Amino acid sequence: MELEGQWWRGQLAADIHQALRYKELKLPSYKGQSPQLNLRRYFADLIAIVSNRFTLCPPARHLAVYLLDLFMDRYDISIQQLHLVALSCLLLASKFEEKEDSVPKLEQLNSLGCMTNMNLVLTKQTLLHMELLLLETFQWNLCLPTAAHFIEYYLSEAVHETDLHDGWPMVCLEKTKLYMAKYADYFLEVSLQDYAFLNYAPSLVAAACVASSRIILRLSPTWPTRLHRLTAYSWDFLVQCIERLLLAHDNDVKEANKQRGQSAPQSTQLTVFQTAQPSRPVHFQQPQYLHQSSLQYRHPVSEQPSRQQIVSTTHTSSYTLQTCPAGFQTSVQGLGHMQTGVGMSLAIPVEVKPCLSVSYNRSYQINEHFPCITPCFER
């Protein structure tokens, strides 16, 4: 988005953030009761791919998926109609978030492969009727905050020159910010794929994406005081969401390794987070982010096998998410008034449907030590 749309850089950033936090308290409840819940992942990925095709901004993409989730939660919709609903949600979201020139045109939508493969043709009248039904369903209110609306504001303080990487001062602050943004974007897409993240407030998901990125990049302290103040979330309130994100990252890494035919001993080297000071210099390599054509968002950071041997295993210690990061617990004792607690979470818990096709294949464990591949920094 252009500079005029970057509200997080302006003088009113704090006020806008507070307004968004207030609005998210009034978000509609999501029950996860759609009969087509097993198709939700496909259509969420479809929206993501189409939005990338038209270079729509992340808030438009996330708003479109959120509109689709709420609409599917209330209606029993056929597969053919779901294509129409998904594209209509994307159109409404793009009209709300983007400039007029960026909104996809009818002929462009009809030329999409998913439409031709299904022998579907959208008409202007059909789209208008569906948009009207969507607007009436949401009571003409599209100002629905998502995690993408908060992430840039939190990223503005996600990396600071006082942060340490594996106990060492950072050499290149701008490069670190670049990789922080890339990982935060990846975790945002992870949260978009699983409806279970609707059980958390959007601002909490955004904060967890930043925290997860800092863990992957081995920045310390993991959740500094400035981020506690900025987000109004303490570490303990983020842990559960962080674990879901890191579990998805773990599965993506394993799947990428499996596709490359890597052996099990190589995969098991990706098991611990570094918290101790390194004994020798390490090097920074750039991860790649690809959106697969099969409507599966994979994290191919593991597709560079040489990176598994970059990090020394002689100076590692396990990082347990259950406890507060070292040096942080005592520094935030006076910030209790910033905590939002349960009030920032959605009121209705998500029902786990047995027909859901989820990307996670392991049970949730509070003490899990999550595997990851970590880009390292030049010395």
UniProtKB/Swiss-Prot annotation:
InterPro entries: Cyclin, Cyclin-like_dom, Cyclin-like_sf, Cyclin_C-dom, Cyclin_N. It comes from the Eukaryota. Coiled coil: none annotated. It holds the Pfam family Cyclin_C. Residues 15-143 form the Cyclin N-terminal domain. Keywords: Cyclin. PANTHER family: CYCLINS. Belongs to the cyclin family. Cyclin J subfamily. This is Cyclin-J. It comes from Mus musculus (Mouse). The gene is Ccnj.
